[in-house]
Amino acid sequence: MAQAQYAGTGRRKNAVARVRLVPGTGKITVNSKDVEEYIPHADLRLVINQPFAVTSTEGSYDVFVNVNGGGYGGQSGAIRHGIARALLQVDPDFRDSLKRAGLLTRDARMVERKKPGLKKARKASQFSKR
């Protein structure tokens, strides 16, 4: 019999993560690398594990992730969003706790575009009255 697989797609800033959950030991693989090797910051690895902590399913699923776009922070947020969506497929009863923790909401904050005549999105040259 085929092993159960659960999929979820997560997005954050410019990063898109396609996540697969397979019942296992809790190993996380990101773009064919171990999560410790791919994401060097320990606090961002904690962000990735938040959905498992909220649903108390740490160590129950192996996670396989394909992620592209963005930097470490955006990719970690996208992986977290994808894992939360995949856990919903595992057990729909997780929805309440995941929603309360804010893990199912797509963070809509994006980089503001640079405006013409300004140095950055909002930074202008110093104003001179005379």
UniProtKB/Swiss-Prot annotation:
InterPro entries, sorted: Ribosomal_Su5_D2-typ_SF (IPR020568), Ribosomal_uS9 (IPR000754), Ribosomal_uS9_bac/plastid (IPR023035), Ribosomal_uS9_CS (IPR020574), Ribsml_uS5_D2-typ_fold_subgr (IPR014721)
PANTHER family referenced in this protein's UniProt entry, alphabetically: RIBOSOMAL PROTEIN S9, SMALL RIBOSOMAL SUBUNIT PROTEIN US9M
The organism's taxonomic lineage, starting at the top: Bacteria, Bacillati, Bacillota, Bacilli, Lactobacillales
Transmembrane helix listed as a keyword: no
Assigned protein family: Belongs to the universal ribosomal protein uS9 family.
Gene Ontology biological process: translation
GO molecular function: RNA binding; structural constituent of ribosome
Ribosomal protein as UniProt keyword: yes
Gene3D superfamilies the UniProt entry points to: 3.30.230.10
GO terms under cellular component: cytosolic small ribosomal subunit
Organism whose genome encodes this protein: Streptococcus uberis (strain ATCC BAA-854 / 0140J)
Protein name as annotated: Small ribosomal subunit protein uS9
Keyword terms, alphabetized: Ribonucleoprotein, Ribosomal protein
